Amino acid sequence: MDYILIGVILGIVQGISEWIPISSKTQVLIVSSSLLGLSFSVAYSFGLFMEIGTIAAAIIYFRREISGLLKALVRMSSRREDYLLLKFLVIVTIITGLMGVPLYLFVISLPILGLPMTVLGVVLLTDGIIIYLSRKNYISRKGLHDLRLRDIIIVGIAQGLAALPGVSRSGITTSALILLGVKPEEAFKLSFISLIPAALGAIGVTVLFSKHEVSQAVHSVSLSGLLISIVVATFVSIFFINALLRFARTNKVVVLVIILGIIAIISGILSGIAKGFY
């Protein structure tokens, strides 16, 4: 198959799956394994590296919030919200790193341990059930200023679990925030902004510990194919961020969250029965 077409396909898969409750890592892993024949560890590392496009999209879409964060970082902001968001991101990112790095090192050793690939489908299905239950029972009342240290730590732990293949980062962090009583629109927004430092850290860890796998993945898809996939992922991501946040502002948010929960459950079932993958 043409590498440019592969790049476009991977970019679309990454751009869509990052923001809805299906694991983008797992979807890219499945597609890249099917189209390129990559091994588990190489495909998994490639999936993390693909997040460059979604990081770019989040920075572009939330540029005002990023500007406020930078001002708060050097104590030049006059807005309390900027300092609260900075505190939130710092704590969440630290907890995510403490959870995520050991999990990542464990995951890339899975083929060595001989664990079956069916674990991906099981984890995805469990993730989907958690997402569905959390959205069914939430009471939306909180904003960023209402979150306590304990709440922020819980969000960090949830995001750290997303290092596991099959676990949706946006799905599990949004679910955690909604379970804590955060308003849906605020929960989506905080989850999406939290992606930026978490994904940057994930890419850094991937390059540090999996240089060979990343190099092999880039060679398999070609540098031009990789760049195309990142650009496509960026544009698709911007569209989906905007669509989800706009929908979350409406009184039809229950429809949105139920649909996202169903998508996660179906994704888990399909991954679990994809016999050609494992």
From Swiss-Prot:
It is found in: Cell membrane. InterPro entries: UppP (IPR003824). GO terms for cellular component: plasma membrane. The chain crosses the membrane at residues 3-23, 42-62, 88-108, 112-132, 152-172, 190-210, 225-245, 253-273. It comes from Saccharolobus islandicus (strain M.14.25 / Kamchatka #1). It catalyses: di-trans,octa-cis-undecaprenyl diphosphate + H2O = di-trans,octa-cis-undecaprenyl phosphate + phosphate + H(+). It comes from the Archaea. HAMAP family: Undec_diphosphatase (MF_01006). Its main location: membrane. Keywords: Cell membrane, Hydrolase, Membrane, Transmembrane, Transmembrane helix. It holds the Pfam family BacA. Catalyzes the dephosphorylation of undecaprenyl diphosphate (UPP). Its EC number is 3.6.1.27. It is an enzyme of class 3 (hydrolase). The keyword Calcium does not apply. Belongs to the UppP family. PANTHER family: UNDECAPRENYL-DIPHOSPHATASE. Disulfide bonds: none annotated. One of its GO terms (molecular function) is undecaprenyl-diphosphatase activity. This is Undecaprenyl-diphosphatase. It is a multi-pass membrane protein.
